[in-house]
Design a protein with these regions (language model features):
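Conserved beta-loop-beta element that borders a ligand/cofactor-binding pocket
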Residues: 165-177
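Short, well-ordered alpha-helices that flank and scaffold nucleotide-derived cofactor binding pockets
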Residues: 7-11, 111-114, 170-173
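N-terminal Rossmann/SDR dinucleotide-binding element
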Residues: 1-85, 95
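Active-site helix adjacent to the Tyr-X3-Lys
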Residues: 4, 104, 162-163, 167
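Conserved Rossmann-fold NAD(P)-dependent oxidoreductase catalytic core, especially the SDR/UDP-sugar
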Residues: 76, 81-86, 92-100, 104-159, ...
Length: 177
């Protein structure tokens, strides 16, 4: 998802983009970034956009995204929106793994946005609509809905994304996110 969002931002705006990328399986974050982008857009030359892309090795699971205070503050004081598609997206595994990335990681992103008064654009999943409504199966679930009685707790991925959305909605209501 992130590569597609980046592509749209690069080709349809003039924005400067800061990408916080984590290392994975001992693969350098910058190398991983280029591999992912070129997988989806093999004919696109990122060098054409290098003056607008700032790649930052970080980790949303760590305090300050595992960045030095100065770099964290620089980001907070120099960006005008956050688009978060960070997520553990497999559908099976241990709930703790999903919680750490999809809920606790989202909490750290949310706290960053609140601290620096930056709008957050959060990418979720239609899966939060659940597997059907418990009491009234004929109700339609839309992007304006959150909890309408749907069943979502049987899948660890869906449950974690539901909890992340709940966290963000509460931050919007209580913390002026």
């Amino acid at each position: 998802m992130g590569s597609h969002i980046l592509y749209e931002l690069l080709t349809k705006t003039k924005s400067r983009i800061y990408c916080v990328i984590r290392e994975k399986d001992n693969i350098n974050a910058i190398e991983r970034f280029y591999e992912k982008f070129h997988f989806y857009f093999p004919n696109e030359n990122l060098r054409n956009y290098s003056h607008r892309i700032n790649l930052i090795t970080g980790n949303i699971l760590k305090d300050n995204f595992n960045l030095p205070d100065e770099q964290y503050d620089f980001l907070g004081n120099n960006i005008n929106c956050v688009i978060s598609s960070a997520a553990l997206v497999k559908h099976y595994g241990k709930y703790e793994e999903f919680y750490n990335t999809n809920v606790a990681g989202t909490k750290k992103i949310t706290n960053f946005c609140i601290k620096y008064n930056i709008p957050l654009h959060y990418i979720s999943t239609i899966s939060v609509s659940g597997y059907g409504l418990v009491k009234s199966p004929e109700i339609t679930f839309t992007e304006k809905d959150f909890y309408i009685g749907q069943s979502y707790e049987d899948n660890v991925y869906v449950k974690s994304k539901f909890e992340a959305e709940k966290l963000i909605l509460n931050a919007c209501k209580n913390d002026n996110l």
